Amino acid sequence: MSGGLSHVPVLREEAVAMLAPRADGVYLDGTFGGGGYSASMLEAASCTVWAIDRDPAAIARGAALAARYPDRLHLIEGRFGDLLALLRDRGVTALDGAVFDFGVSSYQLDDPSRGFSFRTDGPLDMRMGAAGPTAADIVNGYAEAELADILFHFGEERASRRIAAAIVRRRAAQPFETTADLAAVIRTVVRPDRSGIDPATRSFQALRIEVNQELAEIERALEAAASLLAPGGRLVAVSFHSLEDRIVKRFMNAATGHVAAPSRHDPSGLARQAAAPRFRALTRGVVTPGEAETVANPRARSARLRGIERLAA
């Protein structure tokens, strides 16, 4: 990993303050990334943190922080959607708090070899971990209708059908291999608008979500973390786009007793929670970054922070 890469945790102070770590507490950092949330929790109280990340590079980077807190920080390579099994395999059956940052790590976005960005050329990969199909596998192998559905549902791309058709035409002549190659084809279909957003933005988001099954993972992670929280335990989540925030909002509304519509990923799981509130809300609406943070870190602009607390049994 290049030494020039860095990751700035978004809403770190607000998220950790909402989590309110206490001495001897056991906490989960479900999206370790650059370790910012874990470090803040460990500094805030003499607590134990279990940190999960599916990216082997993130786990490797975290070794230095783990060495500073040898008995308090424990790193786990895996998907946060599998956190229930990952923690129970290590003897962890209850948590005093859990925090998630559902955005893509800046380490991943800024490393061309990971294939997440259309701003720099790289292999068309987009995997957050080391296994599974790549974005190239999807654009070169999925049927046109399936591609269009992914772009529409996960990217909210209105030109999804035209983009899918252009992808299929181009791959018939030559398979896609790089991010620049795909972005160029998308830009022939979707022209820039006054917003200044690159025409490839929504399609790249959609492919990344499909590659990593992000939305289903988020739902599994929220359910699992909530099930492990002890009374008074807190669940805090930072989301970055409307699809993520919709899932977090629906889940937390259901957990606090508000009626929630079932998700297409989990048609019955979230709705079951509406009958008996198990949590109270920690926020009225959402917490968003202040001007100083968005100026220092433009990627923070779309961040939304929500939290809930487990009620006594």
From Swiss-Prot:
GO CC aspect terms: cytoplasm
Entry superkingdom: Bacteria
SUPFAM superfamilies named in the record: Putative methyltransferase TM0872, insert domain, S-adenosyl-L-methionine-dependent methyltransferases
GO molecular function terms attached to this record: rRNA (cytosine-N4-)-methyltransferase activity
Family matches, as Pfam families: Methyltransf_5
Binding site for S-adenosyl-L-methionine: 35-37, 53, 80, 101, 108
Enzyme kind, highest EC tier: transferase
Location relative to the cell: Cytoplasm
Catalytic activity: cytidine(1402) in 16S rRNA + S-adenosyl-L-methionine = N(4)-methylcytidine(1402) in 16S rRNA + S-adenosyl-L-homocysteine + H(+)
EC number, as in UniProt: 2.1.1.199
UniProt GO BP: rRNA base methylation
Principal subcellular localization: cytoplasm
InterPro entries membership: RsmH, SAM-dep_MeTrfase_MraW_recog, SAM-dependent_MTases_sf
Key words, A-Z: Cytoplasm, Methyltransferase, rRNA processing, S-adenosyl-L-methionine, Transferase
NCBIfam families on file: 16S rRNA (cytosine(1402)-N(4))-methyltransferase RsmH (TIGR00006)
Role, per record: Specifically methylates the N4 position of cytidine in position 1402 (C1402) of 16S rRNA.
The family this protein is said to belong to: Belongs to the methyltransferase superfamily. RsmH family.
Full protein name: Ribosomal RNA small subunit methyltransferase H
Lineage: Bacteria, Pseudomonadati, Pseudomonadota, Alphaproteobacteria, Acetobacterales
Name of the gene encoding the protein in the UniProt record: rsmH
